[in-house]
Design a protein with these regions (language model features):
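Glycosyltransferase-associated regions of secretory-pathway enzymes
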Residues: 1-66, 81-164
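Small-residue hinge/turn detector
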Residues: 66-78
Length: 164
């Protein structure tokens, strides 16, 4: 079962006006969810971050967000939403089956599974693998991409575990 927790990230406490309104939209469309906004300060409080996090990774907010989404979904489960998403008519209740104990999201083009909205139960095996691969990639950056470039042209083993 996927917990009804929504996680978003913005590096600062204060949100720009447009981002603030989008954040309010997420909260208004999901009154039955616990919505948590993480900031840089919150991320720094997380224990057991990789050694390279504070020296290399923390300077790049996109990578902080990438790491945080995988960390939260793997350890606690719930739903990650990029804070700039706008819900017009539907809510997550209309697009995600919270009783299904699998990773869910959007699989749009070829073998690409989008990560701007991901739902997962806690301790899911796919999220565990994805989290560890994300840490390897963030730590080694360019060398990781070069060594694993062949996956861009073929089916990655993680794709086979998606419910879609």
């Amino acid at each position: 079962m996927i917990p009804k927790n929504i996680y978003v990230f913005w590096h600062q406490d204060r949100l720009p006006l447009v981002t603030y309104k989008l954040f309010l939209n997420i909260k208004q469309k999901h009154p039955d969810f616990k919505v948590t906004k993480f900031t840089d300060k919150d991320v720094l409080k997380i224990k057991n971050k990789p050694e390279f996090f504070n020296t290399v990774l923390f300077k790049d907010k996109t990578r902080v967000s990438d790491w945080l989404r995988m960390y939260l979904l793997h350890h606690y489960g719930g739903v990650w939403i990029d804070i700039n998403c706008l819900f017009l008519n539907k809510s997550l209740n209309d697009i995600i089956d919270f009783s299904l104990p699998k990773v869910q999201g959007f699989h749009l083009f070829g073998n690409i599974f989008e990560n701007w909205v991901i739902a997962s139960p806690p301790k899911n095996k796919l999220m565990e693998l994805w989290f560890h691969e994300t840490e390897k990639c963030l730590h080694r950056k360019y060398s990781y991409c070069i060594e694993n470039g062949h996956y861009y042209d073929s089916s990655h083993p993680l794709v086979n575990q998606l419910p879609h």
